[in-house]
Design a protein with these regions (language model features):
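N-terminal presequence-like segments and the immediate start of the first folded domain
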Residues: 1-57, 61-74, 80-128
């Protein structure tokens, strides 16, 4: 088995329980990201589109720290707390991946780690 390498971008809030990303061989696994600032405070309250933009920015920071780009994302899994937020999420997803979108799954859940969070996204990346 390949060695696991944690990916820890500058500026992202840290959680001692998990790494923002873990590289194993040519794959990078990005932990579920929520819309929080660098101090762990929620952003984009009641605005799924704004939250998704912040999440994609966080994912991009992790991906770029590993030496890849958003074009290298091959799969995302999204968790929404309300299906009515799907259009806002979908708009940002389409803007983030305009040419060759990754495989994508969306799951509606009862809630996320904090009630302010409307969306969470995790990703798998094939490193160049």
């Amino acid at each position: 088995m390949s060695e696991k390498k944690p990916i820890l971008p500058q500026g992202l809030s840290r959680n001692p329980a998990f790494s923002p990303g873990v590289q194993v061989g040519e794959l990078l696994f990005v932990s579920g990201q929520v819309a929080q600032d660098d101090h762990g405070e929620p952003m984009g309250i009641n605005d799924c589109e704004a939250q998704t933009r912040q999440i994609m920015s966080r994912i991009q920071a992790i991906v770029e720290t590993a030496g890849a780009s958003m074009k290298d994302v091959v799969k995302i899994t999204t968790f929404l707390t309300d299906i009515s937020n799907y259009p806002g999420f979908s708009k940002v997803r389409s803007e983030t991946f305009p040419d060759s979108p990754p495989a994508s799954s969306t799951v509606v859940v009862a809630g996320l780690v904090r009630p302010e969070f409307l969306v969470e996204v995790e990703a798998v990346v094939h490193l160049p």
